[in-house]
């Protein structure tokens, strides 16, 4: 076998359509675009969501809700993630140093998901009732 004898398998490659190259090609004259109209013109596209002048769906439906700005500075952390924090005291700066919450976060809540394996002191963070019980069961404590 030589490199100059290699060729793709039969039927695996399709030749590109040669549009507008004579009537005999089957794609000459109008080039598969039909006659006249917006879609036959160059650059003739209809915007996504355009319904021909009818009031579009995204404008017919009412607006709802908003994004709370508090969510930008709040975060949740799971119990099993506390194990990634070095030291016995888990507070906001320790979580940021471990890369578990972003730098702009001001409020963190510990959620019971997974389990905590060692005794830790959670300082200055909010905790759910289940998370608080799990931390205390492991010999740790939660300080507000």
Swiss-Prot record:
Q: Could you name the domain of life of the organism this protein comes from? A: Bacteria
State whether keyword 4Fe-4S applies.
no
Q: Name one GO cellular component term.
A: cytosolic large ribosomal subunit
GO BP term, pick one? translation
Per the record, the gene is rplO
Region (Disordered): which ranges? 1-52
A GO molecular-function annotation: structural constituent of ribosome
Family, per the entry? Answer: Belongs to the universal ribosomal protein uL15 family.
Compositional bias of kind Basic residues: 32-44
Protein name per the record = Large ribosomal subunit protein uL15
Described by its record, this protein's role is as follows: Binds to the 23S rRNA.
UniProt xrefs under PANTHER family = 50S RIBOSOMAL PROTEIN L15, LARGE RIBOSOMAL SUBUNIT PROTEIN UL15M
Q: How does it assemble?
A: Part of the 50S ribosomal subunit.
The UniProt keywords, alphabetically, are: Ribonucleoprotein, Ribosomal protein, RNA-binding, rRNA-binding
Residues in coiled coil? none
Stretches with biased composition (Gly residues): 21-31
